[in-house]
């Protein structure tokens, strides 16, 4: 029973709890989820509430919260430190379930949200790894906006909460990570832009008032969390040993952007330790960075059962009361779980934590609910009160799910006269493979019930007549069933083979040990390709990269597409690309490594940078020195695109004060904290020409290589833009480059520096040298 978020430890205690949980749900669905619209300050039920300051929305959030917490007993405050917050009936405050999920659509994972005959499903978008491949920030926000509309609609009929523990913005550091599919990939800039964009889509109200929230998003899992269960190493006890340079250069930027640029309402701390300290009990990470440096306006929540984990699994404290006190004093406001509810009272009695710290924590929680309008009375009279079942799974929302999948799909190989196929010329199409008729597989994890499914087979059959053979009994493919598949491929005009993974191969609590196609899938692909009469298109459905070197070099396999987990409309999107209704424009958001990489690099080594002394090859395109199967940013379209730099400086002079030490010393870099960084920016203008006849979206990726100082990245994404180009047309793209933000690197101590010397800018095959001098 996977009832706990991020699938917690399977222990006898957990199994007992699961049985209890299911029993309670069956007998009384009022316990764990909203069953009618839940809100405070209901004048119809209790006229006294109109006299309470916390119900007066003409007051500031701060004043309202202050009025509320003064009225609460210590026990009532403690009852509001857990995800299943208790009711305070004397003040007209109902119980509230904080835990809902919306990773790529409203999900019924977590007790705060469920479906019913009133709303049987919600729009399931592609998994974030595929959405990220679109390199389209406006798409990230558009999806968030649709998801929050559907969430509000479900809240209004008592089926959902207002607090969503999404997105997952951890860096996809290692190809084996089972949860990489949930993330925007391996690059800090792309992940940062995704975080801010998706969060804005979820949270922003129509009037743009940043003090109000449409729904409350949550960026997780803070921080350096990317090992679940690898060769017996569990996330509950894993100590991520991370250098200050890697922390500030790789792992922290998405969270910083989420808080500062996205103005997110919540951050979730992770299970793992970082350099010996559990993240949920690290005051430097929580109070120091999230609240202090980044100024979070919202609440900090633990990953589910993390407070219990740091006592029971990590043995970080001697008692449960100590665990409760340590986390609250470190800056935790809300516990996904029951530990704070059970043990905070005892911690107060033992003098381990003071009531003021508890008041501070619940104040952050209540402030979030105030911003959501939870204390403004009847939601039907509030903004978004008109949303309801009619606004879920609308044709427009379902079309956006299809469009998101199309924009993300990546074309990795395309021989002449392969794709696109002509629906007029193809009279028979063989559709083969364990994911060829996938439905549930397409929506990945943290999923909801979709509006409907279109499998690859259904999508392709809408274009041409098909014959189908799965070729494997399941995705694990222990025994390939090649005969039927080979037979239909031998006579068909073209063959589509849909292979890859599913949640039995890569998932939460399940990291891969190899990155080859599972079981006998490779044998199936080779043998079918060998007898195929026409072009063979290999379609890979997966969250992580696969070593498909064999398919790259096999001339019989004429095209390769990676489709991630493409969501409810994935099959339609795949067919749109294969038959040329849509020109592919996705680019890989992560490196695809050879199998040899995972054979020699332990998943537990957190170092990003290569170490020539030990032969350690480094991680991600920014630092990895070895061979790749496919590289970050790879992706083709059906035509070619030419880039041309129209305007870019060759020299940038940094104005330094006369007495600056670098005027006399041989400085290799300048500190970005100094005054010389203010307003130091320039523009780069690029022309982008579509040489093909077919209209196309195109992602322009601007990289730079800094001078070789501070063990800097060998290449780094500086910016990206999606442009729409008609056939044979030209467009202009402008990048505004802030020298100290965009051309800086993180030094060995975690400080940002601008390297002096020659920086190389790259776009496609173009290179432009830019000198930064004093």
Swiss-Prot record:
It is found in: Secreted, Extracellular space, Extracellular matrix. Keywords: Carbohydrate metabolism, Extracellular matrix, Glycoprotein, Glycosidase, Hydrolase, Multifunctional enzyme, Polysaccharide degradation, Secreted, Signal, Xylan degradation. It catalyses: Hydrolysis of (1->4)-beta-D-xylans, to remove successive D-xylose residues from the non-reducing termini; Hydrolysis of terminal non-reducing alpha-L-arabinofuranoside residues in alpha-L-arabinosides. The keyword Secreted applies. Its main location: secreted. One of its GO terms (biological process) is xylan catabolic process. Glycans are attached at residues 48, 136, 437, 530. Its EC number is 3.2.1.37, 3.2.1.55. Gene3D superfamilies: Glycoside hydrolase family 3 C-terminal domain, Glycoside hydrolase, family 3, N-terminal domain, Immunoglobulins. InterPro entries: BXL (IPR044993), Fn3-like (IPR026891), Glyco_hydro_3_C (IPR002772), Glyco_hydro_3_C_sf (IPR036881), Glyco_hydro_3_N (IPR001764), Glyco_hydro_3_N_sf (IPR036962), Glycoside_hydrolase_SF (IPR017853), Ig-like_fold (IPR013783). GO terms for cellular component: apoplast. Residues 1-33 form the signal peptide. The active site is at residue 303. It comes from the Eukaryota. GO terms for molecular function: alpha-L-arabinofuranosidase activity; xylan 1,4-beta-xylosidase activity. Proteolytically cleaved in roots to form a 65 kDa protein. Belongs to the glycoside hydrolase 3 family. A bifunctional beta-xylosidase/alpha-L-arabinosidase, exo-enzyme that acts synergistically with endohydrolases. Releases xylose and arabinose from cell walls. Does not cleave xylan from oat spelts although xylan from oat spelts was degraded to xylose when this enzyme was used in combination with xylanase. Also releases xylose and arabinose from aryl glycosides, xylo-oligosaccharides, arabinan from sugar beet and arabino-oligosaccharides, arabinan from sugar beet and arabinoxylan from wheat. This is Beta-xylosidase/alpha-L-arabinofuranosidase 1. It comes from Medicago sativa subsp. varia.
């Amino acid at each position: 029973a996977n009832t706990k978020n991020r699938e917690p430890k399977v222990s006898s205690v957990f199994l007992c709890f699961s049985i209890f949980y299911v029993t309670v749900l069956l007998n009384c669905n009022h316990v764990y989820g909203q069953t009618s619209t839940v809100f405070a300050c209901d004048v119809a039920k209790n006229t006294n509430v109109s006299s309470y300051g916390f119900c007066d929305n003409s007051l500031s959030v701060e004043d309202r919260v202050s009025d509320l917490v003064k009225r609460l007993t210590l026990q009532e405050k403690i009852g509001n430190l857990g995800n299943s917050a208790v009711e305070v009936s004397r003040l007209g405050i109902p119980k509230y379930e904080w835990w809902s999920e919306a990773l790529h659509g409203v999900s019924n994972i977590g007790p705060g949200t469920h479906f019913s005959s009133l709303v049987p499903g919600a729009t399931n978008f592609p998994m974030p790894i595929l959405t990220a491949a679109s390199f389209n920030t406006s798409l990230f926000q558009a999806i968030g906006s649709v998801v929050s509309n559907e969430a509000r609609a479900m809240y209004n009929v008592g089926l959902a909460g207002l607090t969503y523990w999404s997105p997952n913005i951890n860096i996809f550091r290692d190809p084996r990570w089972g949860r990489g599919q949930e993330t925007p990939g391996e690059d800090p800039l792309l992940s940062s832009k995704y975080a801010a964009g998706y969060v804005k889509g979820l949270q922003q109200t129509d009037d743009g008032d940043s003090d109000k929230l449409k729904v409350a998003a949550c960026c997780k899992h803070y921080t350096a969390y990317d090992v679940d269960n690898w060769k017996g190493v569990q996330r509950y006890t894993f100590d991520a040993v991370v250098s200050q340079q890697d922390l500030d250069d790789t792992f922290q930027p998405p969270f910083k952007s989420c808080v500062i640029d996205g103005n997110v309402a919540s951050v979730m701390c992770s299970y793992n330790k970082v350099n010996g300290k559990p993240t949920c009990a690290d005051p430097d990470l929580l109070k120091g960075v999230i609240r202090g440096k980044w100024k979070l306006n919202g609440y900090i929540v633990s990953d589910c059962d993390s407070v219990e984990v740091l006592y029971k699994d990590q043995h970080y404290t001697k008692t449960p009361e100590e665990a409760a006190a340590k986390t609250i004093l470190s800056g935790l406001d809300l516990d996904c779980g029951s530990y704070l509810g059970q043990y905070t009272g005892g911690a107060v009695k033992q003098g381990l934590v003071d009531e003021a710290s508890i008041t501070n924590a619940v104040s952050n929680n209540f402030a979030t609910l105030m911003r959501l309008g939870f204390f403004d009375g009847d939601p039907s009279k509030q903004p978004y009160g008109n949303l309801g079942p009619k606004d879920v799974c609308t044709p427009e929302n379902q079309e956006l799910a299809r469009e998101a999948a199309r924009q993300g799909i990546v074309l990795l190989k395309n021989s002449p006269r392969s794709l696109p196929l002509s629906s007029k010329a193809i009279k028979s199409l063989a559709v083969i493979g364990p994911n060829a008729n996938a439905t549930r597989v397409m929506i990945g994890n943290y999923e909801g019930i979709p509006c409907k499914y279109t499998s690859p087979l259904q999508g392709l059959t809408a274009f041409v007549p098909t014959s189908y053979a799965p070729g494997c009994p399941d995705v694990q493919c222990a025994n390939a069933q090649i005969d039927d598949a080979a037979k239909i491929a031998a006579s068909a005009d073209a063959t589509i083979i849909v292979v890859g993974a599913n949640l039995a191969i890569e998932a939460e609590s399940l990291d891969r040990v190899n990155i080859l196609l599972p079981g006998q899938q490779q044998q199936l692909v080779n043998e079918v390709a060998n007898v195929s009469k026409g072009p063979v298109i290999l379609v890979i459905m997966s969250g992580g990269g696969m070593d498909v070197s064999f398919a790259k070099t096999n001339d019989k396999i004429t095209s390769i597409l990676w489709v991630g987990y493409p969501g409810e409309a994935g099959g339609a999107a795949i067919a749109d690309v294969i038959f040329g209704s849509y020109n592919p424009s996705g680019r890989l958001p992560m490196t695809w490594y050879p199998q040899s990489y995972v054979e020699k690099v332990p998943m537990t080594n957190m170092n990003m940078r290569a170490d020539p002394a030990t032969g350690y090859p480094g991680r991600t395109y920014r630092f990895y020195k070895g061979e790749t199967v496919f590289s970050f940013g790879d992706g083709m379209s059906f035509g070619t695109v030419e880039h041309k730099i129209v305007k870019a400086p060759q020299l940038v002079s940094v104005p330094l004060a006369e007495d600056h030490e670098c005027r006399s010393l041989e400085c290799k870099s300048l500190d970005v904290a100094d005054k010389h960084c203010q307003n130091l920016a320039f523009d780069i203008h690029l022309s982008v020409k579509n040489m093909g006849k077919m209209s196309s979206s195109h992602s322009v990726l601007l990289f730079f290589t800094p001078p070789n100082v501070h063990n800097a990245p060998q290449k780094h994404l500086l910016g990206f833009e999606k442009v729409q180009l008609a056939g044979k047309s030209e467009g202009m793209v402008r990048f505004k480059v802030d020298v100290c933000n965009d051309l800086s690197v993180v030094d060995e101590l975690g400080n940002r520096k601008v390297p002096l010397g020659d920086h190389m800018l790259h776009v496609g095959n173009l290179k432009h040298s830019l000198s930064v001098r004093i």
